Amino acid sequence: MSNRSAVFGGAGFIGTNLVYQLIEDGQQVFNFDNLSGLGNLLNIAELMQQSRHSFARCDISNPEEIRQALLMAAADTIFFCITPKNPEEESSLDNFRTFFETVKEWRNGMTDTKLHKIVVVVSEHYKLLGSYGRMYTDLLKLLDGYVADGLPISSLLVPPAFGPFQQPDSPISMIIYHAIEGETIPVVNPEEKVSDLVYVKDVVDAIVLVEKNGKIGGHYHLSGPSCGLTNLEAADVICESLNEELPPPVGRYQALIEEVATSPVTSDIAKDEANLVVLGLQGKTSLEDALRKTVNWYLNNPRWYNQSRTRFFYLWQNPETVLKIA
């Protein structure tokens, strides 16, 4: 692995977890985020005094800010952890073009650049499942074009993830927030099997694997672990963990569950993990273990949780918008 890494989108959910892992691996990390959307300085607050971590704001629609970030980092590896917020819009990839065009110009103008790999991480979000297909196809064409121009790009597509540092914008985090707050716990399509859901630590492992072993121009897919749990059973695992670690004043957290029927939410991208397995992908964390670890993380980080609960009040108080409840 490289010694100097630049992470764009490094204050978001997946980016934050990646930054922590890179620092743990001994990397010098240059972290760039525009702090729009769910990007959150609180995610990286404890890293601000670390000598191996530097943070600066960067808007990937601004070529000058991108150039300044590239000059500052002088990175061996770039991790791009930003996914379009509106994948169905024609303009969804405009910022991607700006970013990679700027990187190409910068690299062509440097005689001593050490940049050897750019890993583009495309993460599906539960709320937008079923709307990524066309954007993803167009993105791969865009990336292939820049590979042909000489940029050392590999990509990784990941399904909806959950785990530490996640705001209440997915079914798992929504359940945890509502349970801790003693609110009704919405469980969508309770009898459906959990499918294509992955622990964020496994996502980070896959990103690092692609950086280390992935081919230039390679496009890789990560799938969730095989799981026999229904959505209701997954909620029960979360509630049981909370019953043990944070017993409610009365009864059990399961009493808060409200079953909600809605249209099935599925991805419109067919994933094939075979190429990632060839790189050396290891077994993933089981859903049950990952859910318990996630609950424990929230309970062990009350300062982060309390600030997130306040800042993102509009999310966890409006589950129908997050969970696509009709």
Where are these regions (language model features)?
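N-terminal Rossmann-like NAD(P)+-binding domain of SDR-like oxidoreductases, especially those catalyzing
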Residues: 1-159, 301, 318, 326
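Generic structural signal for small/hydrophobic residues in well-ordered secondary structure
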Residues: 14, 33-35, 44, 175, ...
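Hydrophobic alpha-helical packing elements
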Residues: 14, 65, 135, 171, ...
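The catalytic Tyr-centered alpha-helix of NAD(P)H-dependent dehydrogenases
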Residues: 128-136, 164, 168-172, 196-200
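Conserved SDR Rossmann-fold cofactor-binding beta-strand/turn motif
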Residues: 157-162, 176
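C-terminal substrate-binding subdomain of Rossmann-fold SDR/epimerase-dehydratase oxidoreductases
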Residues: 24, 179-183, 187-326
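Conserved sequence/active-site signature of Rossmann-fold short-chain dehydrogenase/reductase
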Residues: 61, 126-127, 161-163, 198, ...
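Short, surface-exposed alpha-helical segments at coil->helix boundaries
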Residues: 41-42, 137-140, 173, 232, ...
